[in-house]
Amino acid sequence: MVKAVATVRGDSKISGTVTFEQSEENSPTTITWNITGNDANAERGMHVHQFGDNTNGCTSAGPHFNPHGQTHGAPTDEVRHVGDLGNFKTDAQGNATGSVQDSHIKLIGPLSVIGRTVVVHSGTDDLGKGENEESKKTGNAGTRPACGVIGIAA
């Protein structure tokens, strides 16, 4: 079992943790989040980005992790960036907890997300279904108020 964690924070009040667990290379990865400080009753996009670099804030993380050169999509779409995690929903206090399994996200093997960055976005991800070119790149998910590099967990 490989476990990894990202401690998410940034220039905003948003903070939290995103954990990843994978038992073997061909098994799905369980992604669990506990994020606070968002807008109340909102959906916010979350993605794994290419680089584990936060030297210039979350902007340094680069584009979505996309080793197969696909267009942006929903986590359940076959055609999507590997890093497309979709949206999480916040409660009346702006907090979000949840868990999902994803067969594209890997901790083991050449496409591991360890060392890359999880970004929490300021808007709702349109899952590549928007009517403009940006939708196919970013899902129109907005700015990057919080992020964290994915590291190996104990």
Swiss-Prot record:
It holds the Pfam family Sod_Cu. One of its GO terms (molecular function) is oxidoreductase activity, acting on a sulfur group of donors, oxygen as acceptor. Homodimer. The keyword Zinc applies. This is Superoxide dismutase [Cu-Zn]. Gene3D superfamilies: Superoxide dismutase, copper/zinc binding domain. Residues 124-137 have a biased composition (Basic and acidic residues). Disulfide bonds join C58-C147. GO terms for cellular component: cytosol; mitochondrial intermembrane space; nucleus; superoxide dismutase complex. Cu cation binds at H47, H49, H64, H121. CDD domains: Cu-Zn_Superoxide_Dismutase (cd00305). It is found in: Cytoplasm. It catalyses: 2 superoxide + 2 H(+) = H2O2 + O2.
